[in-house]
Amino acid sequence: MCVTKASLPMLSPTGSPQEVEVGKILQGKRHGTISPESCAKLYCYYGVIMVLTVAVIALSVALSATKTEQIPVNKTYAACPQNWIGVENKCFYFSEYPSNWTFAQAFCMAQEAQLARFDNQDELNFLMRYKANFDSWIGLHRESSEHPWKWTDNTEYNNTIPIRGEERFAYLNNNGISSTRIYSLRMWICSKLNSYSLHCQTPFFPS
């Protein structure tokens, strides 16, 4: 005999088909008529219930672990500092008052940045649009009118946009890029990469 307790309650005949079947088996047991087939069915039902219970618990644990281990992948770069504007992988700062080129570069360096550099036409378009009508220093300079233009990290400018004038320090105006003397007063723009990685920056100060 597969069940030894005779005090198991009779299940309602209005229950599910599985409950009715188990009830019949138990009822038959009270009358001493449980067949080997009924006994096997009873064990089968209990086995199915146990398997489903274990599966639900395992699934809950797995989902909980997955949520805990998830790492956001949509934040490739760190946020820009307050009052800076993010564009692609860079942060830009637009000054609120004018200064000469030397002070502007020193200010940017204090923010772990450089006077602004643009690497493509889209970045230049953004700078031109956002500076409004203010002439603004950028990071282009040269030793003399006979030397090539360079950025503050000493990489050469590719001359995609011509620079007007014969002076040594460049700034943006409504006509594009022009040059003037170092002590002229202009607004300025700083730029830096906005990733978590540390990037070495060599300060440039004209002699």
Curated annotation (Swiss-Prot):
<keyword id="KW-0430">Lectin</keyword>
<feature type="glycosylation site" description="N-linked (GlcNAc...) asparagine">
    <location>
        <position position="100"/>
    </location>
</feature>
<keyword id="KW-0735">Signal-anchor</keyword>
<keyword id="KW-0812">Transmembrane</keyword>
<dbReference type="GO" id="GO:0045671">
    <property type="term" value="P:negative regulation of osteoclast differentiation"/>
</dbReference>
<dbReference type="GO" id="GO:0006968">
    <property type="term" value="P:cellular defense response"/>
</dbReference>
<dbReference type="InterPro" id="IPR050828">
    <property type="entry name" value="C-type_lectin/matrix_domain"/>
</dbReference>
<dbReference type="InterPro" id="IPR033992">
    <property type="entry name" value="NKR-like_CTLD"/>
</dbReference>
<feature type="topological domain" description="Cytoplasmic">
    <location>
        <begin position="1"/>
        <end position="41"/>
    </location>
</feature>
<feature type="disulfide bond">
    <location>
        <begin position="80"/>
        <end position="91"/>
    </location>
</feature>
<dbReference type="InterPro" id="IPR016187">
    <property type="entry name" value="CTDL_fold"/>
</dbReference>
<keyword id="KW-0472">Membrane</keyword>
<keyword id="KW-0325">Glycoprotein</keyword>
<dbReference type="GO" id="GO:0030246">
    <property type="term" value="F:carbohydrate binding"/>
</dbReference>
<keyword id="KW-1133">Transmembrane helix</keyword>
<feature type="domain" description="C-type lectin">
    <location>
        <begin position="87"/>
        <end position="202"/>
    </location>
</feature>
<feature type="modified residue" description="Phosphoserine">
    <location>
        <position position="7"/>
    </location>
</feature>
<dbReference type="InterPro" id="IPR016186">
    <property type="entry name" value="C-type_lectin-like/link_sf"/>
</dbReference>
<dbReference type="GO" id="GO:0005886">
    <property type="term" value="C:plasma membrane"/>
</dbReference>
<feature type="modified residue" description="Phosphoserine">
    <location>
        <position position="12"/>
    </location>
</feature>
<protein>
    <recommendedName>
        <fullName>C-type lectin domain family 2 member D</fullName>
    </recommendedName>
</protein>
<comment type="subunit">
    <text>Homodimer; disulfide-linked.</text>
</comment>
<keyword id="KW-0597">Phosphoprotein</keyword>
<keyword id="KW-1003">Cell membrane</keyword>
<dbReference type="GO" id="GO:0042270">
    <property type="term" value="P:protection from natural killer cell mediated cytotoxicity"/>
</dbReference>
<keyword id="KW-0675">Receptor</keyword>
<feature type="transmembrane region" description="Helical; Signal-anchor for type II membrane protein">
    <location>
        <begin position="42"/>
        <end position="62"/>
    </location>
</feature>
<dbReference type="GO" id="GO:0004888">
    <property type="term" value="F:transmembrane signaling receptor activity"/>
</dbReference>
<dbReference type="InterPro" id="IPR001304">
    <property type="entry name" value="C-type_lectin-like"/>
</dbReference>
<feature type="topological domain" description="Extracellular">
    <location>
        <begin position="63"/>
        <end position="207"/>
    </location>
</feature>
<comment type="function">
    <text>Receptor for KLRB1B that protects target cells against natural killer cell-mediated lysis. Inhibits osteoclast formation. Binds high molecular weight sulfated glycosaminoglycans.</text>
</comment>
<dbReference type="GO" id="GO:0009897">
    <property type="term" value="C:external side of plasma membrane"/>
</dbReference>
<keyword id="KW-1015">Disulfide bond</keyword>
<dbReference type="Pfam" id="PF00059">
    <property type="entry name" value="Lectin_C"/>
</dbReference>
<dbReference type="GO" id="GO:0046703">
    <property type="term" value="F:natural killer cell lectin-like receptor binding"/>
</dbReference>
